[in-house]
Each structure stands twice: as C-alpha cells, then as structure tokens.
Amino acid sequence: MPEVVDTCSLASPATVCRTKHLHLRCSVDFTRRALTGVAALTIQSQEDNLRSLILDTKDLTIEKVVINGQEVKYALGEKQSYKGSPMEISLPIALSKNQEVVIEISFETSPKSSALQWLTPEQTSGKEHPYLFSQCQAIHCRAFLPCQDTPSVKLTYTAEVSVPKELVALMSAIRDGEAPDPADPSRKIYKFSQKVPIPCYLIALVVGALESRKIGPRTLVWSEKEQVDKSAYEFSETESMLKIAEDLGGPYVWGQYDRLVLPPSFSYGGMENPCLTFVTPTLLAGDKSLSNVIAHEISHTWTGNLVTNKTWDHFWLNEGHTVYLERHICGRLFGEKFRHFHALGGWGELQNTVKTLGETQAFTKLVVDLTDTDPDVAYSSVPYEKGFALLFHLEQLLGGPEVFLGFLKAYVEKFSYKSITTDDWKNFLFSHFKDKVDILNQVDWDAWLYSPGLPPIKPNYDMTLTNACIALSQRWITAKEKDLNTFSATDLKDLSSHQVNEFLAQVLQRAPLPLGHVKRMQEVYNCNAINNSEIRFRWLRLCIQSKWEEAIPLALKMATEQGRMKFTRPLFKDLAAFDKSHDQAIQTYHAHKASMHPVTAMLVGKDLKVE
C-alpha cells in the first residue's frame, strides 16, 4: 500500500524522519503577547543519507537554529495560508537510518498566533491578572513552536516555562516542580514531563491565576478561584467514570488525570490534553447534567491519545470511538436506556448537520479528503455521530455491546502508541471477527465510509426515554392557537434536563413555530430562566428562528458571553438570517472579534460572510 500522505502538514513526513522528544524552554510575555524560547527537538532519521529536513511553522519568528553547538542554515518558505510556512533545516552531517540529532530552534510566537489566546484581566473572572491558553488541535501546534505538525508522529516532551510569579503554569504533562527564575526574581519557572509519546496537537499550556481542588485520588480540578468550588462539585463523578473507562479500555497509563475549567472564550466543549483535560465553563450546569462531555474527554485517553488518527482525513477514528466509549460510560452509570437515549439524540444531531451542510457535501463523508482544506473549516458533528452510528450498527450486527466492547479493548491494545488509518481499523475488525466475516461482508462499506449524506442504515434505538420528548414536541408542533391553553408547567415535571433538551431539539427540527406558540412556551415553562447551556442554546435558536424580537438581546448575549463554537456559530448564523437582527449580529461580531478566540473569530466571520 502507498504511504498515507498528511496533506495538512508541510513538514518532512514520518517516512523521512520522526521527532522522538521535545525539550521546551520558554518564557511567557503578557505585555508583548509572545512566547519566547528554545525548542530542542530530538529527531530520528528514517532513511540513509538525510541531509536536510522540513518542519512546520506558522507566524513564528526564528532567531537561530543550533546543532551540536553550531549554528546551521535554515530557510523559511512562503506562507501557505492556514498551513503556515515550511522551515527547511540543513544538517551539518548526513544522518544514516535510525541516527538521531538534537536540533535547537530559538523562536518567538506572534501575538496573532492561531494556537494561543491571550486574555486581558477584564476577560477573566478575577479581573486582576491576564491569562493565556493554547489550543493546538488540529494543526495549530506549528503556531506555538516549530514541529512536525502531524498526528502520524508521536513524541515525549519535557518543558520549563517562566511566568510572572503570581501566576500558575500547567501543561498536558505531569507537574515536575517549580522554582524562582534565576534570571528574574519577579518570575517563577514551572517544570513538566510527559513520558507517554503523544502527537503534537496534544501539547498544551495554560497560564493564569489558577487554584486547584482535589476531587479524586488522581484528579485535581483547576480554575480561577471564582469557579473552583463549583467545578469541584460539577465534576465529582470523575473517578467513578475513570474506573469504568479503565474497565472498558484498559489501564490508565498517564498517571494524573486533572481537569482545567477555562474562561468562557474557550472554543470547544472539551479538549483531551493528556493529564489535564481542558473544559468549557458552559458545563457548569449546577446539577452535573452535562457530565457526558467529561465521559467523552476521559474516553479520549484511549481512543485519540493512545490510538490516534494518522491524518485528519481519518478524524472519525478518534471521535467515533470516543463517543462510543463515552456513551458506554454513561450507560454503566445511568442505565442502558440512557445510552440509547443519547445515541438517538446523536442521530438527530447528525441529521441536523447533514441538512445544514447538504447531503452531497463532501464533509458529510466519514473519511474526508482534506487536500487544500483547513480541518477547522471541515469540522462538524459528522466524525462524531456518523462514526458512532457505524460502531453502534456493528455492535448490533456482531452480537451486542459486550461482544463489541471486547473488540474495542483489543483494538486499543493492538494500536496503542500508534497512529492509524481507516484501513488499519477495518483490517483489524475483520481479523478480530474472523468467524463473522460473512456478516461484515454484508455491510455497505463504501456507503458508510466514503459516501456523503446520512448512513445507509439507521441503527435500532430503545425509545423509552425519547418517547416523552417526541410526544410533547408533537403536541406543540401540531397545536392550533386554540390549543395553547392546554399546556402547563406540569408538562416538564417528569422530564430530566436531558429530556427537556431533547424535547427542544425535536421542536427545533421543525422550526419555525408560530410566534404565539413560542411566547406561550416561555409563559408556561419559563425557558428564559433555565441556565443549562444546552437547553438555553436550543431555546434561543427556536426563538430567533420563530422571529421573536424580544429574544434578540438574549441570543446576542449567549453568542458573545461564551465562545464555545457549538453554541456561538449557530446563534450568530440564526441572528444573521433574521432580518430584524441581521445588522446587529454583524455589528456585534465586529465589536467582539478582538476578544474572541482566533479560530472562533475566523469561522464566525466566514459564517457571516464578512471575512
């Protein structure tokens, strides 16, 4: 088979050379919004007579490159939009196969680095200190430091980070001590060590006025002090989830499992940075009801971080398996009917995405072709939910959950510490179920893996918990004006917050509702008072799509006071599509753009067609 090419990276591929280790020494400068330092990369040649190699960089200033104490020649190529600039380094002596070299690169990041968000004190909860966090997935590590920015290469790392002494630095690694900075008494150096090889998109850094609370034998929760106790309460189920995940996936090899609650501008629900999962504060519902995101990030420990997609074309391997594990964890905690309820909710999300993107759109394929496509632009629920649907369908074909979990555990064991493609996964599936090949051959693999739109087959779902949501949503969708007085607050009294959310998701699929219906819904259910972010998001979308002008300020507020793209992008799109809020949406975007995460700002700008 021909070697798989990572079209998202400009660096020498893993067949030419591989980064084995990074030692990072850097200083965080909040005034200049820059990281300045040295990345010492241990690189192993994969071929004989290697005379030069190429690394990924993006908006980095390179001061010098040193090998064995001697400065060496390097050349930065032209910037190629989202891919950045290739950096070619000439080696002083040719390397033979398996020979290693340590390349020390002195670099500085740009204030507009797409990997970093610099927050002013006003953008934090404490309002006193600045804050910095990184988000390298998918291809932003190159805007943090020079690297082979591809998930096909895995490396260990150590780091020493100098920060103002009143702040705390954390990384996706084990904390390895702190000491005053000998070069500057107003600063402190934090040390880190990650002994498990990881793809560089999992390198992460945060610096802020952080505090921690212990919530389990291997877990601290970190945040600004204003959120730390609330976070400790919200995530108290972490250890029981970790234990279930170990039962399903195998031993937890990373030592510590800490969690960081970020400021509201963080773009994702969570990011599975090893030893330190990053999560959005929109999970702080007050009742632990959004803990499925926690189960998701815990599951990534095995599927994503141990077994990794070789290129971003195969992103579904990371996300589909992780959603599958996440739902099993929740099923173990809350029952099999709950697992099916969330699985069916996920099918609904997939339907929405396919409808939004279009059923022939290439990004609705499970395996995508990202040649000349920024992975951030291709990002959607498809790799998560179409991936999950395939695994759920296979579970039902091959003998049920226990049988398929046996496959999953074997899959993790087989491919741990490796990066793989869909073909590797499929070949292993066929060898694991060699006595059921006739069943596997009945699967329409081409339709599932390589065709756009919804999957060829919808799995079977237990409807127990979903039926009440469908029944209530149907009452609203079919109600005439004269029926509106038949609704009352008691409609929701037997529904969990998960079911209220699903009820709104069902109504939203049929939006718009007549304006009188939405006003009546507010009257009887007081939806505006609900703080659960998932429910609030769907409620406000329903209001805007049904053209309720009074909801405009509430929707603008939610779109801007947090930056989780799952919420912010659809809210802005809905506001821009409503004539009464179109101009305001664009004005609000321009007013907030400078304080938004760089990736969020770019994608919302594209959505609004102003960038």
From Swiss-Prot:
Cofactor(s) needed for function: Zn(2+)
Pathway connected to this protein: Lipid metabolism; leukotriene B4 biosynthesis
Enzyme Commission number, as recorded: 3.3.2.6, 3.4.11.4
Record text on activity regulation: Inhibited by bestatin. The epoxide hydrolase activity is restrained by suicide inactivation that involves binding of LTA4 to Tyr-379. 4-(4-benzylphenyl)thiazol-2-amine (ARM1) selectively inhibits the epoxide hydrolase activity.
Subcellular location: Cytoplasm
Cofactor comment: Binds 1 zinc ion per subunit.
One BP term from GO: leukotriene biosynthetic process
Phosphoserine PTM sites in chain numbering: S416
Gene Ontology molecular function, alphabetical: aminopeptidase activity; epoxide hydrolase activity; leukotriene-A4 hydrolase activity; metallopeptidase activity; tripeptide aminopeptidase activity; zinc ion binding
Site feature: Covalently modified during suicide inhibition by leukotrienes: Y379
Transmembrane segments: none
Classification via Pfam families: Leuk-A4-hydro_C, Peptidase_M1, Peptidase_M1_N
Location of the active site: E297 (proton acceptor), Y384 (proton donor)
Gene Ontology terms: cellular component: cytosol; nucleus
Binding site for Zn(2+): H296, H300, E319
Keywords: Acetylation, Cytoplasm, Hydrolase, Leukotriene biosynthesis, Metal-binding, Metalloprotease, Phosphoprotein, Protease, Zinc
Sequence positions that bind a peptide: Q135, C136, Q137, S267, Y268, G269, G270, M271, E272, R564, M565, K566
Positions where N6-acetyllysine occurs in the chain: K73, K337, K414, K573
PROSITE patterns hit by this protein: ZINC_PROTEASE (PS00142)
Reactions catalysed according to its record: leukotriene A4 + H2O = leukotriene B4; (5S,6S)-epoxy-(18R)-hydroxy-(7E,9E,11Z,14Z,16E)-eicosapentaenoate + H2O = resolvin E1; (5S,6S)-epoxy-(18S)-hydroxy-(7E,9E,11Z,14Z,16E)-eicosapentaenoate + H2O = 18S-resolvin E1; Release of the N-terminal residue from a tripeptide
Residues under site feature: Essential for epoxide hydrolase activity, but not for aminopeptidase activity: D376
Entry PTM: Phosphorylation at Ser-416 inhibits leukotriene-A4 hydrolase activity. activity.
Biological role stated in the UniProt entry: Bifunctional zinc metalloenzyme that comprises both epoxide hydrolase (EH) and aminopeptidase activities. Acts as an epoxide hydrolase to catalyze the conversion of LTA4 to the pro-inflammatory mediator leukotriene B4 (LTB4). Also has aminopeptidase activity, with high affinity for N-terminal arginines of various synthetic tripeptides.
Complexes and interactors: Monomer.
Record-stated family: Belongs to the peptidase M1 family.
The protein's name in its UniProt record: Leukotriene A-4 hydrolase
Source species of the chain: Cavia porcellus (Guinea pig)
Gene: LTA4H
